[in-house]
């Protein structure tokens, strides 16, 4: 068996066509959505991510607002920049690119974002709304995972999903999305400290690996025909690699590659959150 590739790039391109149509309709109605970014420091990876997001804006037809700050700024300067975007009518939604330099308080910065302008969907208020089933910007990576599985007709209703990783960007909110009535999956949330992880993953219809441990999910941990979504990101020999080993492709029914799987959809749903807010306003 060779697994079907869950192609995030092709799926992203399909979403971009739809988003461009919606952005054009908003412009025709006198509304031009704008995505803002706040980037602190000189981290090459962060700069690459931010460049990609602004390139995406150009493809879809969104305005983009970029605030690049030196690494040695203080907390007050960062907070003032956040306040500026909160008040900027041209900024429909924005993100603070993480990680921040260690001397800055990430939680304070993220909580200062106007929840209605939270393009990442990770503000505590919006995560609380997700728990309550209320309308709010959804976390981009979990939303992308669910969309990608549906795009390839991977059955979610009644499925047992094992999520490996307990971070706030993927693992925790993904469980909330998958257990909504619209998805109706059963979720087991695991992490690097879970005992006998393989016994749990072998029961899973879907495995989502988001622990950041290179090649931790191997073929002997996967039920034949299961779907495996690789979200982990690590560097091995100066190359980006995921949490899923190559031999999994010989056992699984579906595999999302990494890179090229969920990552493009994370960026697509960042723009989706911005456009949706413009449509609601």
Curated annotation (Swiss-Prot):
Keywords: Amino-acid biosynthesis, Histidine biosynthesis, Hydrolase, Methionine biosynthesis, Multifunctional enzyme, NADP, One-carbon metabolism, Oxidoreductase, Purine biosynthesis
Name the record gives this protein: Bifunctional protein FolD
Keyword Ligase on entry: no
Alphabetical GO biological process terms: L-histidine biosynthetic process; methionine biosynthetic process; purine nucleotide biosynthetic process; tetrahydrofolate interconversion
PANTHER family cross-referenced by the UniProt entry: C-1-TETRAHYDROFOLATE SYNTHASE, CYTOPLASMIC, C-1-TETRAHYDROFOLATE SYNTHASE, CYTOPLASMIC-RELATED
Recorded family membership: Belongs to the tetrahydrofolate dehydrogenase/cyclohydrolase family.
Quaternary structure and partners: Homodimer.
Function as written in the Swiss-Prot or TrEMBL entry: Catalyzes the oxidation of 5,10-methylenetetrahydrofolate to 5,10-methenyltetrahydrofolate and then the hydrolysis of 5,10-methenyltetrahydrofolate to 10-formyltetrahydrofolate.
Listed CDD domains: NAD_bind_m-THF_DH_Cyclohyd
Pathway: One-carbon metabolism; tetrahydrofolate interconversion
Keyword Membrane: no
The protein's Enzyme Commission number: 1.5.1.5, 3.5.4.9
Reaction catalysed by this enzyme: (6R)-5,10-methylene-5,6,7,8-tetrahydrofolate + NADP(+) = (6R)-5,10-methenyltetrahydrofolate + NADPH; (6R)-5,10-methenyltetrahydrofolate + H2O = (6R)-10-formyltetrahydrofolate + H(+)
NCBIfam families: PRK14193.1 (NF010789)
Annotated organism of origin: Mycobacteroides abscessus (strain ATCC 19977 / DSM 44196 / CCUG 20993 / CIP 104536 / JCM 13569 / NCTC 13031 / TMC 1543 / L948)
GO annotations of cellular component type: cytosol
UniProt-recorded Gene Ontology molecular function terms: methenyltetrahydrofolate cyclohydrolase activity; methylenetetrahydrofolate dehydrogenase (NADP+) activity
Binding site for NADP(+): 165-167, 192, 233
Source taxon at top rank: Bacteria
